């Protein structure tokens, strides 16, 4: 009698183990079926000073957008506060740990939004240097084994307060916007023009006129999300 009970318990445990193994396999398969999107950028991507950043930075809002649209996407936030494109800048993106993490992410889509910090006096060299280093950054992702699709997002315009410094930054970010469009055309990559999109929306910015607030982050998420949906119809 006792032996039979032991056999029944063993069978029960065996069935539970099989179910758990099957469930894990299903979960792993489901995760693999999700297209990974790597959001590359600076504090505008990371969500610096955005209210409740962990819920409202643009990559998280993009994840919510995809879930509401019932699309199987997994969004990764690889934004680095203070990061710039130029290799001689104070904080080159390619020297950051998150850059390495983004290349290991095996993304199917890379969304690059960099350039805002390149406009500062301490980071700026010239537009030719920016273009060269931006192209190098693109190539780093093009050479990945996962062969991700790459989208370029122009940085938003800078809301100048009239000071000499901000006026210079506003001019440089427009140069950068034009350079990114040229690079995108040359490489046959999708370019999302956040610069023009943001021109009439001062309400998207924090007080410094550079960083985006919660509404600005949502606008970026909607723009990227709309593009993903339209390209997968």
Specify the residue positions occupied by each region the protein language model found.
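N-terminal Sec-pathway targeting helices
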Residues: 2-15
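Active-site neighborhood of divalent metal-dependent phosphoester/pyrophosphate hydrolases
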Residues: 39-41, 82-85, 117-118
């Amino acid at each position: 009698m006792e032996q039979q009970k032991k056999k029944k318990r063993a069978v029960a445990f065996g069935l539970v183990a099989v179910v758990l193994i099957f469930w894990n396999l299903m979960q792993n398969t489901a995760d693999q079926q999700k297209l990974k999107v790597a959001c590359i950028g600076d504090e505008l991507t990371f969500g610096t000073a955005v209210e409740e950043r962990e819920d409202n930075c643009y990559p998280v809002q993009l994840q919510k957008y995809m879930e509401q649209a019932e699309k199987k996407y997994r969004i990764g936030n690889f934004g680095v506060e203070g990061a710039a494109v130029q290799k001689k800048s104070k904080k080159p993106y390619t020297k950051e740990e998150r850059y390495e993490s983004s290349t290991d992410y095996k993304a199917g889509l890379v969304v690059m939004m960099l350039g805002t910090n390149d406009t500062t006096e301490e980071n700026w060299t010239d537009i030719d240097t920016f273009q060269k280093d931006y192209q190098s950054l693109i190539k780093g992702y093009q050479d990945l084994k996962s062969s991700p699709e790459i989208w370029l997002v122009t940085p938003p315009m800078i809301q100048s307060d009239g000071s000499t410094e901000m006026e210079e930054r506003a001019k440089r970010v427009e140069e950068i916007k034009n350079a990114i469009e040229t690079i995108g055309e040359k490489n046959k990559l999708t370019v999302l023009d956040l610069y023009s999109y943001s021109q009439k929306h001062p309400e998207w910015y924090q007080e410094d006129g550079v960083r985006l607030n919660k509404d600005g982050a949502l606008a970026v998420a909607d723009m990227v999300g709309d593009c993903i949906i339209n390209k997968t119809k």
